[in-house]
Structure formats: structure tokens, C-alpha cells
């Protein structure tokens, strides 16, 4: 029997509870969770990652829900998906994907994966890298050396 593979993608810069939630919920949708970590050069929709891609990959690989983690392709985001052949592709609540367009692109490549958007993590106010960076800047800028 073939394992039901799930693919989750993201930058995963400054890991936080929202990332863990996204990956945990993604893992529940199949037997294997494959995570494609964005390459530094391909992050164009937001500021460049603070952590280099190799470190982000190592951290994601160490997370309990993750069975396999790889770096994305340099030029074609669908190349790893072609290789993995997932049953499901998950996208985070705030990822900039047009779900219908993504479904069309998958169909064009004969990749019949279901696309599932994972909901927002609601158990804390520091569930995004942007909010964490903002909190650090505010704390350090005010002379307060405590983050929490």
C-alpha cells in the first residue's frame, strides 16, 4: 500500500508556534509529511529570510510532525512536487497562494493533489515571524532586555 503523502511549503524563518501548528495539522491529513522549505533566492513576496536556508531546513527537519524536509527547486516550485507525488498539498492561512490557480497549475502538470488551506493558530499572539521581529525591536529599542 502506498503512503498518503502530504506536502507543506513555506519559508519557516524564525520558527514559531504557528509553524508547528501548520505542520501538525498538515501531518494529520496523511501518512507522510513532506515539507518544502523555500530557498533564500525564491522568497520575493516578503523580506528576505533572516536565517539561511540550510538552517531553516535543519530546524524544520527536526520537528516531530515532519517525515521529510527538502529545499525547494531553484527555478520551478513544482519540480519537488512532481517527484513527491502528494495526495494533498497544504497551504498556511496567510500564504500567498490563489487556491484555484494552484489547482489549475497542478492539473496542467497531471498532479491530482487536493489543496487544503490550514487555519490560523489561535493560541498566542506571537504566531508569526513578523510579530516576533516586531516584539524584539520594540523590546530592544526601549532598552528592555527582556523579550517576554
Curated annotation (Swiss-Prot):
The keyword Transferase applies. It holds the Pfam family CTP_transf_like. ATP binds at residues 11-12, 16-19, 94, 121. Pathway: Cofactor biosynthesis; FAD biosynthesis; FAD from FMN: step 1/1. Its cofactor is a divalent metal cation. InterPro entries: Archaeal_FAD_synthase (IPR050385), Cyt_trans-like (IPR004821), FAD_synth_RibL (IPR024902), Rossmann-like_a/b/a_fold (IPR014729). GO terms for molecular function: ATP binding; FMN adenylyltransferase activity. SUPFAM superfamilies: Nucleotidylyl transferase. Its EC number is 2.7.7.2. It is an enzyme of class 2 (transferase). Belongs to the archaeal FAD synthase family. Homodimer. Catalyzes the transfer of the AMP portion of ATP to flavin mononucleotide (FMN) to produce flavin adenine dinucleotide (FAD) coenzyme. This is FAD synthase. The gene is ribL.
Amino acid at each position: 500500500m502506498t503512503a498518503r503523502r502530504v506536502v507543506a511549503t513555506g519559508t519557516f524563518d524564525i520558527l514559531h508556534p504557528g509553524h508547528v501548528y501548520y505542520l501538525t495539522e498538515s501531518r494529520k491529513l496523511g501518512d507522510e509529511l513532506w515539507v518544502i522549505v523555500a530557498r533564500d533566492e525564491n522568497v520575493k513576496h516578503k523580506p528576505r529570510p533572516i536565517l539561511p536556508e540550510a538552517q531553516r531546513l535543519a530546524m524544520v527537519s527536526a520537528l516531530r510532525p515532519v517525515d521529510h524536509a527538502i529545499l525547494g527547486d531553484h527555478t520551478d516550485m513544482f519540480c519537488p512536487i512532481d517527484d513527491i507525488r502528494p495526495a494533498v498539498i497544504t497551504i498556511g492561512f496567510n500564504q500567498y497562494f490563489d487556491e484555484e490557480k494552484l489547482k489549475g497549475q497542478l492539473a496542467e502538470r497531471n498532479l491530482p493533489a487536493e489543496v487544503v488551506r490550514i487555519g490560523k493558530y489561535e493560541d498566542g499572539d506571537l504566531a508569526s515571524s513578523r510579530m516576533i521581529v516586531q516584539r524584539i525591536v520594540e523590546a530592544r529599542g526601549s532598552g528592555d532586555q527582556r523579550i517576554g
